[in-house]
UniProtKB/Swiss-Prot annotation:
Record bears the keyword Membrane: yes
Transmembrane residue ranges: 5-25
Bilayer disposition of the protein: Single-pass membrane protein
Record localization: Host membrane
Keywords: Host membrane, Membrane, Transmembrane, Transmembrane helix
Organism: Spiroplasma virus SpV1-C74
Protein name according to UniProt: Uncharacterized protein ORF12
S-S pairs: none
Length: 49
């Protein structure tokens, strides 16, 4: 396996791990904020119809 291939492979894995961690943190923040905003957003959607 050429060195450039292993380098690309490791970079992709590292980026994937960072993206996965970032998404999990983002979803937790979204859930915390979502609990507060859910009621307001539902009321807005119903009033827009």
């Amino acid at each position: 396996m050429p060195t450039w291939l292993t380098t690309i492979f490791s970079v992709v894995i590292i980026l994937g791990i960072f993206a996965w961690i970032g998404l999990s943190i983002y979803q937790k923040i979204k859930q915390i904020r979502g609990k507060k905003k859910d009621k307001k957003e539902i009321e807005r959607k119903e009033s827009n119809k």
